[in-house]
Design a protein with these regions (language model features):
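Positively charged n-region of N-terminal signal peptides that target proteins for export
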Residues: 1-4
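Secreted/extracellular ectodomain signature
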Residues: 6-8, 22-186
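Bacterial N-terminal signal peptides
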Residues: 10-20
Length: 186
C-alpha cells in the first residue's frame, strides 16, 4: 500500500512539474476560459469613490488586494469614460505602502517571505512605489492619515511624491461620504 501511495505521489509530482510546477489561483487542469455574457452591464457616467485602505491583505504573491482593486477601478473608469474622483485613504497596516524607498527600508521589518526581521531593516525599497505612481498618473488621489503618520514619526519627506496627508483617516472618509462619495472598504 505504501508503495502505491509513493508511486502515486511521484506520478503526481512529475505531472505537476511538467505543467509548470506552480499552482496558481486557477486550477492547472481547468478547461480554457469559456465565452462570458454580461447580463448586467454597468455604465457609470460619473462616480466619486473613496477607498478605506487600512488593512493589508495579500493576494497570491506579494500584491495587496487593495492595490489590485484600486488599479482595476481606475482602469475601468478610464475605459468606460467615467468622470469623477477616486480617493485612496491609507492608514493603519497599509500605510507603509505610501513610504519612499529610504523610509520603507528603515521602517519595514517584515521580509518578503512574511518573517519578522527583528535585527534589521529591509533593503529592497518600496516595491509598491511604481504602482502608486501609476495610480496617481491615472488620477487617483493618494492620501495618508495624519494620525498614522504621527504615530510612526513620519514626515512629508518620508512619503512618495504626490501623496497628500489628511488630518485623520476616519474624519476624512466621513467628510468624503458626506460629500456623496461611495465608500469601498477593504
Amino acid at each position: 500500500m505504501k508503495r502505491k501511495i509513493r508511486l502515486f505521489a511521484l506520478v503526481f509530482l512529475c505531472s505537476t512539474v511538467s505543467l509548470g510546477g506552480l499552482w496558481t489561483a486557477k486550477n492547472a487542469f481547468a478547461k480554457p476560459d469559456s465565452p462570458l455574457h454580461i447580463d448586467i452591464p454597468v455604465k457609470l457616467e460619473k462616480a466619486n469613490v473613496v477607498f478605506d485602505m487600512g488593512h493589508l491583505v495579500m493576494s497570491t504573491g506579494d500584491m495587496p488586494f487593495l492595490l489590485g482593486d484600486l488599479n482595476l477601478l481606475a482602469s475601468d473608469f478610464k475605459k468606460s469614460g467615467t468622470t469623477g474622483n477616486i480617493v485612496a485613504v491609507f492608514h493603519g497596516d497599509a500605510a507603509y505602502l505610501v513610504l519612499n524607498d529610504n523610509t520603507y527600508n528603515l521602517d519595514r521589518r517584515v521580509l518578503n517571505d512574511g518573517r519578522y526581521n527583528a535585527g534589521g531593516h529591509v533593503k529592497s525599497g518600496n516595491p509598491y512605489a511604481e504602482l502608486m505612481g501609476e495610480l496617481m498618473k491615472q488620477g487617483v488621489q493618494i492620501e495618508l492619515c495624519g494620525a498614522t503618520a504621527r504615530a510612526n514619526h513620519w514626515g512629508n519627506a518620508d512619503l512618495l511624491p504626490g501623496v497628500k496627508v489628511n488630518t485623520d483617516a476616519m474624519l476624512r472618509i466621513t467628510q468624503l461620504e458626506e460629500q456623496g462619495y461611495t465608500l469601498i472598504y477593504e
